[in-house]
Amino acid sequence: MRENRSIPSATVIPVLIYPDVREAVAWLTEAFGFVERIRIGESHRSQLRVGEGGAVIIGDVRSDRVPPRKGEVTHQMKVRVEDVNAHFARAQEHGATILKEPTDFEYGEREYDAADPWGHRWQFSETLEDVDPAAWGGTLLTDE
């Protein structure tokens, strides 16, 4: 794939819709530690960077794009972090709605779930150890 400084290098780049792009970017950078990479207009879009190569685009509301309605879950973003407990504390400090406290799972991850003020669901995950998928009932189909 060719490089383009205008587009994040990640293969999959989710675009999440928020009613106020600037307000959402301010909250996501403060609460979840994202870094604003590119701003497109004052209220149109922003690209946010997270970790090593991860990216998300925050877009504005238009006639064919709306944020989730209260109580409606259409997706969940999974973000890998170095220290899930520290990340959890930061998210709580900035008013994230905690849906699930940090929990260790048999597949080697420690995770917590949160919602931002606009209803988007986020899961943050720290790798504790490398675990063979067969150990917890998974089947490895490709070695990437």
Describe each model-derived feature in a short phrase.
Residues 118:
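C-terminal catalytic core of tyrosine-transesterase DNA break-rejoin enzymes
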Residues 16-20:
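Short, surface-exposed ligand-recognition loops at beta-strand->loop->(often short) alpha-helix junctions
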